[in-house]
Amino acid sequence: MASKNSTSLALFFALNILFFTLTTATDCRCNLSPKPRTVPSPKVPSPKYPSPSIPSPSVPTPSVPTPSVPTPSVPSPNPTPVTPPRTPGSSGNCPIDALRLGVCANVLSGLLNVQLGQPSAQPCCSLIQGLVDLDAAICLCTALRANVLGINLNVPISLSVLLNVCNRRLPSDFQCA
């Protein structure tokens, strides 16, 4: 009988420990009691009485004429900025990095080598798209002279070929020296 009591006591302690472990692990600090619902009482608007208005005495203010003095109008000089005319030749500066114009080598090599179809001129033409014809010619001339394109060619012919592919014109009297 003693073994039956000790087994029952051991089972009781084991279940007790299990119960306390589970309740401690799922501790919820929630308010389990529901709040009583309060029915809001209808609000009765309080009567509003107009505040008494106190008439203010009207005192006429004397009008003082302000003297008007005409201000002389001084014509502001609008100087028009004088831009020096560009001289023909490649003495100008290219607003594009000449190394980026290396993509134009594909256009020239595609035109010189026998290939089926047309070479893709889009990367080259998109670089000089926003430039005027003279700036585009200066940029391509700089790239050709620096041999950025990696092709030894006749510079004036290559320049006009590149400009024609991009639907640009070589400015008259322009010399890529």
Swiss-Prot record:
5 X 58 AA repeats of P-S-[IV]-P-[ST], as annotated region: 52-76
Annotated Gene Ontology cellular component terms: extracellular region
Sequence repeats: 52-56, 57-61, 62-66, 67-71, 72-76
Superkingdom of origin: Eukaryota
Family indicated by similarity: Belongs to the plant LTP family. PEARLI1 subfamily.
A Pfam cross-reference name: Hydrophob_seed
Compartment annotation: Secreted, Cell wall
Gene3D superfamilies: Plant lipid-transfer and hydrophobic proteins (1.10.110.10)
Main subcellular location of this protein, as a coarse class: secreted
Compositional bias (Pro residues): 37-87
Secreted among keywords: yes
Disulfide bond entries: none
Signal peptide as annotated in the record: 1-25
PANTHER family according to UniProt: PTHR31731
Protein name, entry field: pEARLI1-like lipid transfer protein 3
